[in-house]
UniProtKB/Swiss-Prot annotation:
It comes from the Eukaryota. Coiled coil: none annotated. The keyword Heme applies. It comes from Sorghum bicolor (Sorghum). This is Cytochrome P450 CYP99A1. Gene3D superfamilies: Cytochrome P450 (1.10.630.10). One of its GO terms (molecular function) is heme binding. GO terms for cellular component: membrane. Its EC number is 1.14.-.-. It is found in: Membrane. Its cofactor is heme.
Length: 519
């Protein structure tokens, strides 16, 4: 897609950036660039977050790039991130237009990509009050309990109790743990959002959105060459996914409406969807609380995609790091088993506050592998100063959260998986102080400011219980005699950062229980 865009760009136009008239401040420094395509060659890699970190080390924490026809500024230091995400939050609170959001998210009618304004404020307030606040998350404890126990049963089944994991000759049972945690995450999010389990059909649309949601489609880089995405078939693929999504949601909405008519009252069994249908008003104005059927679809996809992709990817990365660090695995398992032994499964989530080291493991996993390494892009709404440089109106602003969390200036041994860095007795007060609220800008896996991910409490509750139960019920080993240092850690980056290949592991039960008999 990038090659096609470049060829047509060379044949069609010459784009030059004109300096702001009367500007006394200088543009941020940046690397060399070519006519027409600007700095795109610097990002011709499967690891754009790494390439941007390396460029920032040469050119500074506030760096200018010309991406095709788009001006972009990359933020790579906590001080600059604070300026953008907190000090001048409203200036950078909107999103640039992206092809994926225009098509799959119904013209950016969701919460993540909606333009900053009254409609976005209404959507955020609605999602927080009805699904994502701490009280609502606690109420969903039974859902998390049920689905994470189902995950344990699926591991058993996949490993050999009917799932074919153990071969005819008694080979070690290998399970695709990545696929299983993805299914668990989708089940939790689906039941919370729709009141029912979701099938893989929605995940197929999520995969399309993640793959093309990075903002590097031809039309996103060369707005005047929007037709390139038509010629290459990308627009058709996105519309095919959108029609598939419409069919899925039309069926789900019809089922929910039928139940409501039959019961003649809200029962709470339809999850967040039931609330949205109650306040639906296809003729109302969004700013006054009216919400259309189309907007409901966009919000639902936002919740399903965000809640599923982030939690499952994080769980898979955390388990990967633990497999590479056996001493951390042993320490976390000892803590989990000490806290959960003798407790009924229904009491497991109530013991999470005792799992301080396991929570450090989760925090460290999110430091090394933020699911959104470049967060979601922002758009500068008025010309302003960042780090002593001018950022002009309309500039796309990219915050490299991955680089912030691996800065050697802020972190000791930043490339090492070391959960102990967050302990009170580790001697690193800066690391101990970090949390998930986005107030320490060297650690912002969920972003910061007005556009911070509102689902962090929801996602963390599911993630921590999922990891704790995987550590409690099973011992894990690598297949085929693989050594920890040989584990594949390759990534693929679209709008999120996934493992290139799902994690495959060999489980063995910690103790024989009604859940783990069969391996």
């Amino acid at each position: 897609r990038l090659i096609s865009a470049v060829i047509l760009a060379v044949c069609s136009l010459i784009s030059r950036r004109k300096p702001s008239p009367g500007s006394k401040k200088k543009r941020p420094p940046g690397p060399w660039r070519l006519p027409l395509i600007g700095n795109l060659l610097h990002l011709a890699t499967s690891q754009p977050h790494v390439a941007l970190r390396d460029l920032a080390m040469k050119h500074g924490p506030v760096m200018y790039l010309r991406l095709g026809q788009v001006d972009a500024v990359v933020i790579s230091s906590p001080a600059a991130a604070q300026e953008v995400l907190r000090d001048k939050d409203t200036t950078f609170a909107s999103r640039p237009s992206l092809l994926v959001a225009d098509i799959i998210l119904y013209g950016s009618m969701d919460m993540s990509f909606a333009p900053y304004g009254g409609n976005w404020r209404m959507l955020r307030k609605l999602c927080m009050s009805e699904l994502l606040n701490t009280h609502k998350v606690r109420q969903l404890a039974a859902v998390r309990d049920s689905e994470t126990l189902s995950l344990v049963r699926k591991v058993v089944y996949a490993a050999g109790a009917g799932g074919g994991g153990r071969g005819q000759r008694g080979e070690a049972p290998v399970v695709n743990l990545g696929r299983l945690v993805l299914s668990c995450s989708m089940a939790i999010t689906g039941r919370a959002t729709l009141g029912k389990l979701c099938g893989d059909e929605i995940m197929s649309v999520v995969d399309v959105a993640v793959l093309y949601g990075s903002g590097f489609c031809a039309g996103d880089l060369f707005p005047s060459l929007w037709f390139v995405d038509v010629v290459t078939g990308l627009t058709r693929r996105l519309w095919t996914a959108r029609r598939r999504l419409d069919a899925i949601f039309d069926r789900i909405l019809a089922e929910c409406e039928a139940r409501q008519r039959q019961e003649e009252k809200m029962t709470g069994d339809d999850g967040f969807l039931g609330v949205l249908l109650r306040i639906r008003d296809d003729d109302g104005e969004p700013e006054t609380g009216g919400i259309s059927t189309t907007s409901i679809k966009a919000i639902l996809f936002d919740m399903l995609a965000g809640g599923t992709e982030t939690t499952s990817s994080a769980a898979e990365w955390i388990m990967s790091e633990l497999m590479r660090k056996p001493e951390a695995m042993a320490k976390a398992q000892a803590e989990v088993r000490g806290a959960l032994d003798g407790k009924s499964p229904e009491d497991h989530e109530g013991q999470m506050d005792k799992l301080s080291y396991t929570r450090m493991v989760v925090k460290e996993g999110l430091r090394l592998h933020p699911v959104l390494p470049l967060l979601l892009p922002r758009s500068c709404q008025e010309t302003c100063d960042v780090g002593g440089f001018e950022v002009t109106k309309g500039t796309k602003v990219i915050v490299n959260a991955w680089a912030l969390a691996r800065s050697p200036e802020r972190w000791h041994d930043p490339e090492e998986f070391r959960p102990e860095r967050f302990a009170d007795d580790d001697g690193s007060s800066a690391a101990v102080a970090v949390d998930y609220r986005g107030s320490q800008f060297e650690y912002i896996p969920f972003g910061s400011g007005r556009r911070m991910c509102p689902g962090n409490t929801f996602g963390l509750a599911a993630l921590e219980l999922m990891v704790a139960r995987l550590l409690y019920y099973f011992d894990w080993s690598l297949p085929d005699g693989m050594r920890p240092e040989e584990l594949d850690m390759d990534t693929v980056v679209g709008s999120t950062m996934r493992r290139r290949n799902h994690l495959h592991l060999v489980p063995s039960p910690y103790k024989e229980t009604e859940l783990t008999v069969g391996i």
